[in-house]
Amino acid sequence: MTDQKLKSAPLAYENDQFLNSPDGRILRLLSEYSEPLSRFRREQIQDTVVFFGSARIHSHNDANSRLTEVRGNAAQVSPTQQSEDMKRAEAAVDMARYYEDARRLARLLTEWSSQIPAKRHRFVVTTGGGPGIMEAANLGAHEAGGKTIGLNINLPFEQFPNPYITPSLNFEFHYFFMRKFWFAYLAKALVIFPGGFGTLDEFFEILTLAQTEKLAKKIVIVMYGSAYWKKIINFEALVDAGMISASDLNLFKMSDSPEESFEFLKQGLTKYHLGPQQPKRNGDAAVPEIAKTRP
């Protein structure tokens, strides 16, 4: 026998070694569902308008400052490097208009939605929580005095929370698919600004859900910046090749101004999510209150 006392084992829900192991994965997944759900309920969030777009698009001020800096460094770098730096800096200045447009559109939407009589917050501007277009949309909503959501993702580069997210609605996800779930689940509208791989991934996933009618709601979709998107994606070629139906092009609208986009979104959101009560669809009874079209 020994007089040495055995230490108590850690409680399972406080055992970091277990929680961060493969065996604890299901609990981590449930946490990224249950914790956001709890906060959305507490913050009285009914539904959202999601903005997707590049983290690499800067404001006019930042882009012009960078261009001035590049011009000032001309004597310190090789001609080849200077040419490349100028090309990127000038492109950033050109793309900066999308930052300002996202900011303007988010402000218009928030000013309108804040006037909707409802028990919960309607059509809350939501982004991926990072810089670029995400920052611009959160900024516009913040300037309008509304709540605004950031669904951030833990990455080794590029992603950090912008300062315009409502602090109590700032989220950090480990799993991409859980983050995507919350984008899709609460969204009643989607605005896609110019972006790269991440934006395309997010857009096409929700577009596919809408096209296959896997969403138990009508989602209003705007592709912002027709010149950019028509250069990046040839939707007409997909129709001509028989890969999609011509009617699939009605799933979204191309737009080039904040005011035009706002009117389209307002009309669609009013028609599908603020109008007279429509017949329930299969699965409506299982939808938590925060995600329903009407309280």
Q: Which residues are covered by each model-predicted region?
A:
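C-terminal functional extensions of proteins
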Residues: 223-295
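Short, acidic/small-residue loops that bind anionic groups at enzyme active sites
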Residues: 145-158, 193, 207-231, 247
